[in-house]
Amino acid sequence: MLENPLIQQVLFEIMDEDVVGFDVLSVLINTNEVTDDEISRQLDVKLNNIRRILYKLYEARLVDYNREKDEETNWYTYTWKPSLEKVPALVAKKMKNVLKDLKEQLELEETNMFFFCSDCEIKFTFEDAMDSGFRCPQCGGMMYEYDNKKDISILKEQINYLEDEFNKNPLFSAY
């Protein structure tokens, strides 16, 4: 399941783009139940970093934990285990949101005329450009008409790719 690029992207975002998170998940999947301290030693990563990743995964409900108190030291030991059955639903929800945003952007691109400040590299709608007298509000430079055909093409490609991935992957068929 973790080999799927869409799943990897969503997990990457959940873990704040920390690639060590994939190593943490691999340890959890391979051992099924492990303490944060054992993960830290096994990966040779600081315990605080491991805990931060585990908390992010827990917030997304992708891991669970058990807490046990050592009667001699009064310290708590947290044993973590994967709970990846929610991954397909999480990815499906994220994909639907991304598709919705891409389709809204595509509609905006297809129904508007744009102008561009080449100095600031900022794109403006016709209305915004007209309101500022076709002068960039950032630098005062002239705005020029922007041909957004390439942007439209890229958006369509992204939408088609995501829809194809979503439709062909059996993990997401229930969503």
Curated annotation (Swiss-Prot):
Job of this protein: Transcription factor that plays a role in the activation of archaeal genes transcribed by RNA polymerase. Facilitates transcription initiation by enhancing TATA-box recognition by TATA-box-binding protein (Tbp), and transcription factor B (Tfb) and RNA polymerase recruitment. Not absolutely required for transcription in vitro, but particularly important in cases where Tbp or Tfb function is not optimal. It dynamically alters the nucleic acid-binding properties of RNA polymerases by stabilizing the initiation complex and destabilizing elongation complexes.
Gene that specifies this protein: tfe
The protein's matches in SUPFAM superfamilies, at most eight in alphabetical order, are given as: Winged helix' DNA-binding domain (SSF46785)
The protein's matches in InterPro entries, at most eight in alphabetical order, are given as: TF_E_archaea (IPR016481), TFE (IPR039997), TFIIE/TFIIEa_HTH (IPR017919), TFIIE_asu (IPR002853), TFIIEa/SarR/Rpc3_HTH_dom (IPR024550), WH-like_DNA-bd_sf (IPR036388), WH_DNA-bd_sf (IPR036390)
Report the superkingdom from the record. Answer: Archaea
User: How does it associate, per the subunit comment?
Assistant: Monomer. Interaction with RNA polymerase subunits RpoF and RpoE is necessary for Tfe stimulatory transcription activity. Able to interact with Tbp and RNA polymerase in the absence of DNA promoter. Interacts both with the preinitiation and elongation complexes.
Q: What is known of its domains?
A: The winged helix domain is involved in binding to DNA in the preinitiation complex.
**Gene Ontology BP term (one):** regulation of DNA-templated transcription
In Gene Ontology terms, what is one molecular function of this protein?
DNA binding
Q: Which Gene3D superfamilies match?
A: Winged helix-like DNA-binding domain superfamily/Winged helix DNA-binding domain (1.10.10.10)
> Does the record bear Transmembrane in its keywords?
no
Alphabetized, the UniProt keywords read: DNA-binding, Transcription, Transcription regulation
**The HTH TFE/IIEalpha-type domain covers which part of the protein?**
3-88
Q: What is the protein name given in its UniProt record? A: Transcription factor E
What family is reported?
Answer: Belongs to the TFE family.
UniProt keyword Protein biosynthesis present: no
